[in-house]
Amino acid sequence: MNQKQSNLLTLATRLGVNILNIYDYQNKDSVIKCSCSSHGHIIENTVDYLLKTNFECIECMHLKAMDVTDTTPFFLSLDAASYVSGMSLFNKEGQLLGHKTFSIDKKKDFFERVEELKREIEKIVRENNIQCIILEDIQYQQNPVLFKKLAMLQGVLRYTIINELKVQLITAMADEWRAYNHIYGAKRQDQKNAAIERARAIFKDNIPEDESESIFLGYYGIYVYNNEPQEED
């Protein structure tokens, strides 16, 4: 065994994975087969991909996602837009409890749509006693009119969440939550498709794109929440 193979074996072991064919590792494109230490699930891909994803076991993620005992909502994740928004609920442990798409008639005035989305968020927060909302931040759009509308929507939602609902707010840029969830793609549609495929792999279900993205936005936001100091009650 050479040093490169030894280093990879050590890393995989530290991450809870057993490499079954370490001698096949020659370069980043080498395909290696592993088994997770928890349940023995087989993980097989290129070294490059496995390093990017920290040797994650999708089957273990599926088991965790399905093994929900606490059904009390804590987090609300919002991939918000004035027409179609993806929404997901999670318990305090970060397990998905539910998801939906909230659509508003495009014929309605912009501010009417904003008000409708605002009311829906208020309803969800109050009915479920939500303690933390995770909201995707905006980034500059080539279309200045669209960017202006998204900025106005963000302002209304942030004010509502912080000042009216008095709920903790976590925001995340799209590049941040996609990188955390290993969602890649050069084009926007590629990224959407990657989110859908990842959701299908974890939940064994066909989840629409806006809902899939709200789920992975939520996972990242929960990671941020768990790694920042929390105020004591």
Q: What positions do the PLM features span?
A:
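Functional cation/ligand-contacting sites centered on basic and imidazole/sulfhydryl donors
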Residues: 1-68
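Phosphate- and other anionic-substrate recognition elements at nucleic-acid/protein interfaces
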Residues: 66-233
